[in-house]
Regions:
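Conserved small/polar residues in nucleotide/adenosyl-binding loops
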Residues: 174-181
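Intrinsically disordered, low-complexity regulatory segments
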Residues: 1-173
Length: 186
């Protein structure tokens, strides 16, 4: 049973013994033990993960796995990887910790657990799509800004991202440009 205005956005299968991180648009996050979220029937509401400030909402959650780190991407196109150890385990339903300084660097668009051998695909409000290897994004402790992972304008913003397996491009950009210009690189 969901309250009016609520929605189910993410589902993940786990072993029941992990830490979970939930992050919000206003830059807060909470890390809690999965075992703190008690088992309930399928018609129940569930349990509160994080206490939200007025107007704030959840932008993502991640299961802390050994070979992954947490990627945070802002609407202004900045991103950073952080170790899950940077997030102190708390009791669920609290206010959490500052994950990202949104007043300075923009609101959080999404978070995702990532591995170094993966890529992320980001999409902006204006429909611009960019693919970036995770290993090219620097790691910083929270609440650092990170590095530019997607250029946005004042009128545009990052709205979503997906994590995909890394794939080498079929044709290099240099080869493509040389072919288009009959060998004359521009």
């Amino acid at each position: 049973n969901l309250d009016e205005g609520d929605e189910l956005s993410w589902v993940e299968i786990t072993d029941g013994n992990r830490n979970l991180i939930v992050a919000t648009h206003d830059g807060m996050s909470i890390c809690f033990k999965e075992s703190d979220a008690r088992l309930i029937g399928r018609t129940a509401r569930g349990v509160r993960a994080i206490q939200l400030a007025e107007g704030d909402y959840v932008v993502g959650f991640a299961v802390a796995l050994e070979d992954t780190c947490l990627l945070t991407v802002s609407e202004t196109g900045y991103g950073r990887k952080s170790n899950f150890d940077d997030y102190r385990v708390q009791s669920r339903a609290g206010k959490g910790l500052i994950n990202y300084h949104t007043e300075t660097y923009g609101k959080v668009a999404m978070i995702a657990p990532v591995r170094e051998d993966q890529d992320i695909i980001m999409i902006s409000q204006e429909g611009i799509v960019i693919r970036t290897p995770v290993d090219q994004i620097s790691a910083f402790k929270r609440p650092a800004k990170g590095v530019r992972v997607m250029r946005t304008t004042d009128e545009d913003k990052v709205v979503t991202l997906s994590v995909v397996e890394h794939m080498e491009p079929a044709v290099s950009y240099t080869h493509l440009r040389a072919h288009e210009t009959r060998g004359n690189l521009v």
